[in-house]
Amino acid sequence: MTSEKGPSTGDPTLRRRIEPWEFDVFYDPRELRKEACLLYEIKWGMSRKIWRSSGKNTTNHVEVNFIKKFTSERDFHPSMSCSITWFLSWSPCWECSQAIREFLSRHPGVTLVIYVARLFWHMDQQNRQGLRDLVNSGVTIQIMRASEYYHCWRNFVNYPPGDEAHWPQYPPLWMMLYALELHCIILSLPPCLKISRRWQNHLTFFRLHLQNCHYQTIPPHILLATGLIHPSVAWR
């Protein structure tokens, strides 16, 4: 039975939650909103407590804002262990990827997991290399799935009373397409996902352009999961 309560007024994270409409416009994978949003969780050492908050673009990207805030507000010993999870509306650009790597090199006790709703200018070679460098540095990067969207809705959104289960359920195809392109990036393959926007009716179009190298390198079950590849396609 669905609870008739929204986030409790006694919830210490309530003032740091975003509104439902903000979550929708920032994290809908079909939208190409320019601004970025970051929802994050921090867990220190062996503590079970999780610190949650959010951030948005200012004059800097949200990733840089987080790093500045994190390093300035706490006397953080480099050897202290800390687990950080980011839920980003856009993947980091190459400059932010470099800043993240520098931050992690100065704080070897920090582990970082990044979930992204969309890939930022994924055709740009510098952005692609930046994401590969992060992965090679030990950062986990994944596309947000339904479970991550629900987690964010429950823990970061000031949803109305009774609407805990009424989180936005976006079509899984968009998530699968972005996940496929992320595989291409990590494996140093050419882009396979083309994205275009028709501004008159605000529709976003996704198109797959697979080459032989994609069929040769990407596991078949990942390609088949999109539902756009026929099982009879010959893998070489």
From Swiss-Prot:
Its GO CC terms are: apolipoprotein B mRNA editing enzyme complex; cytoplasm; mRNA editing complex; nucleoplasm; nucleus
Instruction: Please indicate if the UniProt record lists S-adenosyl-L-methionine as a keyword.
Output: no
Q: In which tissues is it expressed?
A: Expressed exclusively in the small intestine.
Q: List keywords of the entry alphabetically.
A: Cytoplasm, Hydrolase, Metal-binding, mRNA processing, Nucleus, Zinc
**An example Gene Ontology molecular-function term:** RNA binding
The CMP/dCMP-type deaminase domain covers 10-134
A Pfam family this chain is assigned to: APOBEC4_like
Assembly information from the UniProt record: Homodimer. Interacts with A1CF; form an mRNA editing complex. Interacts with RBM47; form an mRNA editing complex. Found in a complex with CELF2/CUGBP2 and A1CF. Interacts with HNRPAB. Interacts with SYNCRIP.
Record protein name field? C->U-editing enzyme APOBEC-1
Its source organism is Homo sapiens
